[in-house]
């Protein structure tokens, strides 16, 4: 097994929306550098989640090629500026933001009214200018996702009068890696892996690498317990293995994890003694935490908790 160290050799914040980090991983066996570098690059660029504005409603506007009286930018320019807005969301459900402003004024993201689950990374990010005493009203929907979300231009079918925006959720804007060989002896060659990460400020380069590694761990973890035995025994043995898994493998939020621990729920076996309704009876365990646990069980282990506890007559 290879044990390596990772060191951050350079870190800088060029602006609220630009962070950079350079890292070195060493020592690696020959061939491991490209394996790690390529896996991290693909995962970090495609799988890390971010937040973006996906739809907008502007008072008095019915299509994206309109102009707004008293506003310097037309609707299309405003949509393009909103597409660049960098956000961080602590909610998996869509959120609504708003602004109502009378001019003359400069509209920046710092003037947006957003739920507490949403963090605006750059409050000075420019959106538009109101040139006279026009009242500008706008609502926008924020969603969480990964990669790109390309949509057909036009109104959002989910909400009347909402114009859709092509959303870019990727928190990492660029990722480079290089591998350098180091000859230790005539028969031993080790490698040094250099990583360069650029982010949009919604997370740091260090966080990006950590989250990317967690995604890869979750992806490969099921392969660590392969056991091809008699098909008749497979289901029972799989169930026993699952029951022994600790709740740490669900990668829950700190709040949900602590509530389960205080309720003496330490393993999946303990958790399966509860129904969805019974989870809500745990002290300080709200609907949001229950939904998080239910989703984690389904996505990571393929287990669906019953809505209610089955009561069998004895």
Curated annotation (Swiss-Prot):
It is found in: Plastid, Chloroplast. One of its GO terms (biological process) is DNA-templated transcription. Residues 1-227 are annotated as: Alpha N-terminal domain (alpha-NTD). One of its GO terms (cellular component) is mitochondrion. It catalyses: RNA(n) + a ribonucleoside 5'-triphosphate = RNA(n+1) + diphosphate. Pfam families: RNA_pol_A_bac, RNA_pol_A_CTD, RNA_pol_L. The keyword Chloroplast applies. Keywords: Chloroplast, DNA-directed RNA polymerase, Nucleotidyltransferase, Plastid, Transcription, Transferase. SMART domains: RPOLD (SM00662). Signal peptide: none annotated. DNA-dependent RNA polymerase catalyzes the transcription of DNA into RNA using the four ribonucleoside triphosphates as substrates. In plastids the minimal PEP RNA polymerase catalytic core is composed of four subunits: alpha, beta, beta', and beta''. When a (nuclear-encoded) sigma factor is associated with the core the holoenzyme is formed, which can initiate transcription. Belongs to the RNA polymerase alpha chain family. This is DNA-directed RNA polymerase subunit alpha. The lineage of its organism: Eukaryota, Rhodophyta, Florideophyceae, Rhodymeniophycidae, Gracilariales. The gene is rpoA.
